[in-house]
Amino acid sequence: MHELAEQFAKYCESTFNLATLSDYGYQSLSVCILDCVYSLRAKYYAVTIPLVDRYAQTYMGGDPRASGDTVSMLISRMDEKGHKAFADNVVKNQQKLGGRNKIPKEEIVYQLARYFQALHIETIEDFQNFECQEILEIVIHAVHGLGDAGTNYLFMLAGDPNRCKPDVHIHHCVRDACGRDVSNEECQALFTDAVALLRGQHPSLTVRGLDGIVWRAYQSRA
């Protein structure tokens, strides 16, 4: 048990409505990739959600929660359109990621999609059933610009209930609750242990669910 777990759990219990559950809802891995990459260092509701909606309007009959939009479909569309035209005319976003050597986000999307294609991962079900989740995590983490937050968030979007995305809002909450910050790795352990303590009163609560509750609360204050 993490040494700060009890303190963090008490803070969450007293600060948030823990009955509010997140609905990620995507049924196609293509939009999970887009949401993941374009949410990093961006305003989620102002930038990411409209961007995913634009992709869905162009290719998914207007429904970002539709199933059947595979990784290979995303790759083919980017190849046919051209990466810059895809960025300019479909998702309409020219953001970059990656410290000093920044890379356009559409190139990060493409690289991640190609890695999945090489592993024969086309759907959310393929992702969830991949034979070695540890290898999958290493592969995702190797994509330029994703880091711990992007890696964990993609797992969350693809249905993993046991992860948190250690972004600026999550770390802000940890500092408020515990008086100090923790590493990304500790953040995962802290959320996991806090949820274990809270489940007696909140049996439906998951790590992913607590992450969503915390994130929405702190994002609204930003």
Question: Which residues fall in each region the model found?
Answer:
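A basic, often C-terminal nucleic-acid-binding module that engages the phosphate backbone, implemented
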Residues: 185-222
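Catalytic DNA-binding helix-loop module of base-excision-repair DNA glycosylases/AP lyases
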Residues: 38, 130-180
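Alpha-helix N-cap and coil->helix boundary residues
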Residues: 46-50, 104, 165, 169, ...
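Short, hydrophobic/amphipathic alpha-helical patches that form generic packing surfaces
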Residues: 31-43, 108-115, 156, 209-219
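Intrinsically disordered, low-complexity, charged terminal extensions of DNA damage-control enzymes
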Residues: 1-17, 219-221
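Alpha-helical ds-nucleic-acid-binding substructure associated with the helix-hairpin-helix region
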Residues: 61-144
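Structural motif
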Residues: 20-31, 43, 96-105, 201-206
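Non-catalytic DNA-binding core/recognition domains of DNA-processing enzymes
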Residues: 28, 45-58, 65-68, 102-112, ...
